Swiss-Prot record:
This is ATP synthase subunit delta. It comes from the Bacteria. It comes from Priestia megaterium (strain ATCC 12872 / QMB1551). It holds the Pfam family OSCP. F-type ATPases have 2 components, F(1) - the catalytic core - and F(0) - the membrane proton channel. F(1) has five subunits: alpha(3), beta(3), gamma(1), delta(1), epsilon(1). F(0) has three main subunits: a(1), b(2) and c(10-14). The alpha and beta chains form an alternating ring which encloses part of the gamma chain. F(1) is attached to F(0) by a central stalk formed by the gamma and epsilon chains, while a peripheral stalk is formed by the delta and b chains. Belongs to the ATPase delta chain family. It is a peripheral membrane protein. GO terms for cellular component: plasma membrane; proton-transporting ATP synthase complex. Keywords: ATP synthesis, Cell membrane, CF(1), Hydrogen ion transport, Ion transport, Membrane, Transport. The keyword Nuclease does not apply.
Length: 181
């Protein structure tokens, strides 16, 4: 089975458990911590995947690194470790976040703009586009891209809304070339 499929299964199991316990947000916060720990300390992944380090020692590292987290999250990380699937932890957290956002009516969106967006601009974009994708709100991350010249490009899931000047110029350019032939 592919890693993304396995990550989805683990995320779904965690999400169902969190739903039963009414701990969706708390679980997401704790999984975010796990993801951040692995992102900030890539050496941890190296240690946990090293073939010469015993599984008992690896479990000890995990227990120490995540001692402050709930037993459920600790157990999940240990389970991934025991089943040699620790590499999917980031994908699992991403899948859990997606499931939690679906329940809340939230979607992640990436907005590309020439300059950083203000909080008001992000809020306005969220209000304008959330209903177009059937959501209540959008979690917006902003990436500055000077090549756009002006305007914005918005990515929500696999949908792209391109209102950039560079895109409009490209469309005009293609139109002129088509009429030339």
């Amino acid at each position: 089975m592919s890693q993304p499929a396995v990550a989805k299964r683990y995320a779904l199991a965690l999400f169902q458990l969190a739903t039963e316990k009414q701990m969706i947000d708390e679980m997401q916060d704790q999984l975010q911590i796990v993801e951040e720990v692995f992102a900030k300390t890539p050496e941890l992944m190296d240690v946990l995947t090293h073939p010469k380090i015993t599984i008992e020692r690896k479990k000890q590292f995990v227990s120490e690194a995540f001692a402050e987290l709930s037993p459920t999250v600790q157990h999940t990380v240990l389970l991934l470790l025991e089943r040699h699937r620790i590499q999917i932890v980031s994908e699992m957290v991403k899948e859990y976040r997606f499931l939690a956002n679906e329940v809340r009516g939230v979607a992640d969106a990436t907005v590309y703009s020439v300059k950083p967006l203000s909080a008001d601009e992000k809020r306005a974009i969220s209000q304008s586009f959330a209903s177009k994708v059937g959501k209540h709100t959008l979690n917006i991350s902003n990436i500055v891209d000077k090549s756009l010249i002006g305007g914005v490009k918005l990515r929500i899931g696999n949908r792209i809304y391109d209102g950039s000047i560079s895109s409009k110029l490209e469309t005009i350019h293609r139109g002129l070339l088509a009429h030339r032939s």
